[in-house]
Amino acid sequence: MAAVLEGQEPEETAAAAEDAATSTLEAVDAGPGAPFLPAGNQLNLDLRPGGCHRLQYLCSQQPPQLLQVEFLRLSTHEDPQLLDDTLAKVPWSLLRLRSLVLKGGQSRGALGACLHGTLTTLPAGLSDLACLAHLDLSFNRLETLPTCVPELHGLDALLLSHNHLSELPEALGALPALTFLTVTHNRLERLPLTLGSLSTLQRLDLSENLLDTIPSEIGNLRSLSELNLASNRLQSLPASLAGLRSLRLLVLHSNLLTSVPTGLVHLPLITRLDLRDNRLRDLPAELLDAPFVRLQGNPLGEASPAPPSPPDISQVPEMPRLLLTSDLDSFLVTPHGCSVTLACGVRLQFPAGATTTPVTIHYRLWLPEPGLVSLGPHDFLLSSVLELQPHGVAFQQDVSLWLLFVPPRVRRCREVVVRTRSNNTWNDLETQLEEEAPKRLWARCQVPHFSWFLVVLRPVSNTCLLPPEGALLCSSGHPGVRVTFPPGVTEEPRQVSMQVVHMAGLELRTLLEESEASVSPLLCLSQSGPPSFLQPVTVQLPLPPGVTGFSLDRSHLHLLYRTPLTTTWDDITTQVALEFTHLYARFQVTHFSWYWLWYTTKTCVGGLARKAWERLRLHRVNLIALQRRRDPEQVLLQCLPRNKVDATLSRLLVRYRGPEPSETVEMFEGEKFFAAFERGIDVDADRPDCVDGRICFVFYSHLKNVKEVYITTALDREAQDVRGQVSFYRGSLPVEVPAEAEAARQRKGTDALWMATLPIKLPRLRGAQGSGQGTDFSLMPLNLGDAETGFLTQSNLLSVASRLGPDWPAVALHLGMPYHKLQRIRHEFRDDLDGQVRHMLFSWAERQTGQPGAVGHLVQALEQSDRRDVAEEVRAILELGRHKYQDSIRRTGLAPEDSTLPGTSASQTPESAQA
């Protein structure tokens, strides 16, 4: 084995060490004192606990097999002192050791994340391992590189990933045989200048660190073939990188680069240069046209933003800060400006002078529904809808708005924008993203007026103002897509934009049942102004994957055009003159719409393109219905993407039980659907989202699509269980979805709208549970709240009391009830839990009658007690009451008509949908 290792590449050495993990320690576990013998030249002690004790035992016994060991794996999830004592014995006992793996990561935390080992240093004696060629210290707690490592002059591969290293020592350059070095996922802020002395280094991985500069000495690594600097903070690169003549792979994505050395494109062996997700705005033509360069996610062709002028701190007074609670829906803005945080998490900042007179701002957070949400064919909704009033009010200075949104699952070639309604049209605002914490993202924008606002994920859009002199528009998501406008193409400047949508090749081949089929990215071109141009415009699209301009069969290539305002795709291959290069196809058009290149042996491509386009917009989901274990009358309904079902169920089944999820169904973004309880089971509440006994949903793929409802039955539960069911039915589709798409997707049969049915069981009531709620409980009529915000009546409070159960003491304390009074209620109703809850809730309510903010206090107490399900039900009751009150005063003519919602009438109640 030793003779073979002399000529192995570093990856082969690492692979040999990894193969050692599959061997086991030959041990006789018959009793204490059993001998532990290595298997051949491999000793693997990381697969079982107690590895250090086993190694110490072997070192003390010195069996002959120990002298043959060349591969040692030892877990670092051990006591630090025991680990240090054990490693100190290694140089004296394992003289032929060539590979030493001291990794953490074998243990996992509660959330499944790999845990780091306890290793913080190495004994100095390890430098005596003269044969050591492979050292793996990954997933540990190293803050500095142990001093013995640079003294291992025979080291060929060094793995330091997932540690806490902030720098590497200058002595690292004294490893003359090193060919493989990885230091990913550390905290490196600088690199040693001696790194350039590693003349034999072939692979270097420094990704996921904090590097902002690279020393020019890195250009001395003449043998380097792979260099990974992804996910750092690099703003520029040294020109010496162009001297790495052996370089084949250079990965620089997810940095802050604004420029790159032009010489990189001339490296003789380079096969991939990854520059995605940087800040590159202008690149030489050699880099733009090179087939091995990846440029997605860069603002190519966009103008640099003007740097903000620093404010004069000495003259700027401190801005007032307002923090609104859940019972407030308005605030006052004065000419001095203010910073406001709404109860829903939204933030606003009004600069001084934004208003000339005091203005009262009202806000409301709407649950999304088609009438309130405007989405393009390939857009996804990421937030609820925020309404700010008064609509259309003009500010003297732009107001800053921060909206929380759901982090998108996929960001490749997509961008997050804030969408607003202005002059009866929806527009996207220039948006910056800010990360407060992992998975807590803000979309920030400047708003000149108030209206409706929502956060949308859309394909990357590139826009320019086209002058009569012509222009070149490139896609930052796919730099190979570009549109060339010749001089004289327009008389007046007009706005032109492009979007590029990708389709997975596997889905296409499954749809066409053809293994060789492929398509180019889908290109959408739009403009403001006349529908056609004065001169033809040249469009460049990349050829479908696997197809080159020199080998393609032209009879299999089709250029498709989607007619505006229709759903049909026309094959216009014979109507345009297609020009081909090795990687691209070029053609000229005078109208803008959707364009798509297909390479297939099929002949009727238009119909297939329509199906493929619809497939891009469909989501495969499953429906679940679960009952709370301690309260079967509480039912959770949710629509989940297929790939999230298992993880969600594993989290919910601790508190819920229920049937298996439904079969997979397909839904469009923004599609309505309903849940109807059947066979003796009904919804036990008057809810604004309950229409004709059915719970209304609107599906948005990135939102939760979940509701918790309470159910009841008119059947006798004292005699037996009530076995009912909940069925899910389709509702209306978004307006942009064509009718033929709806028809093609529906089931054939008597009920084409039915999607799934899941069983629901209300268990038999036993003993005193069979008596009706509150049959022996009587109070005077009670109203909490007011007509504007909504009332809670006696029956509403009884319903709330029936939900609380053993959680009522926590709610009572959050409502401000003294602990001694809580104990007295427990004593007076010690055998009656329902009596305890009702007495607590109604005694509090009687004291609050006529006082403002009582209902908001109750909702806040429920949320603080982790009963958000009951808090949402209270909000739903108030919402319904508020709508009824507003409708009644409109019918009697006591109030003027409010400004209507987009897509709804003034008298129409917006149908709530679950975010």
UniProtKB/Swiss-Prot annotation:
Subcellular compartments: Cytoplasm; Nucleus
Expression (tissue specificity): Ubiquitous.
Pfam annotation, one family: Death
Keyword Transmembrane appears in the UniProt entry: no
Domain Death, chain residue ranges per copy: 793-878
Gene Ontology biological process terms from the UniProt entry: apoptotic signaling pathway; DNA damage response; DNA damage response, signal transduction by p53 class mediator; extrinsic apoptotic signaling pathway; extrinsic apoptotic signaling pathway via death domain receptors; negative regulation of apoptotic process; positive regulation of apoptotic process; protein autoprocessing
Annotated catalytic residues: 449, 451, 591, 593
Start and end residues of each ZU5 domain: 327-459, 460-601
UniProt keyword annotations, A-Z: Acetylation, Apoptosis, Cytoplasm, Hydrolase, Leucine-rich repeat, Nucleus, Phosphoprotein, Repeat
Source organism superkingdom: Eukaryota
Region annotation Disordered: where it falls in the sequence: 888-915
GO cellular component, one term: cytosol
PTM summary: Undergoes autoproteolytic processing whose extent either directs cells towards survival or apoptotic pathways. Autoproteolytically cleaved into two main fragments PIDD-N and PIDD-C. PIDD-C can be further processed into PIDD-CC, a processing which is enhanced by DNA damage. The cleavage producing PIDD-C is required for translocation of PIDD1 to the nucleus upon DNA damage and activation of NF-kappa-B. PIDD-CC mediates the interaction with CRADD and the cleavage producing PIDD-CC is required for the activation of CASP2. PIDD-N remains associated with PIDD-C and PIDD-CC after cleavage.
Protein known as: p53-induced death domain-containing protein 1
Annotated organism of origin: Mus musculus
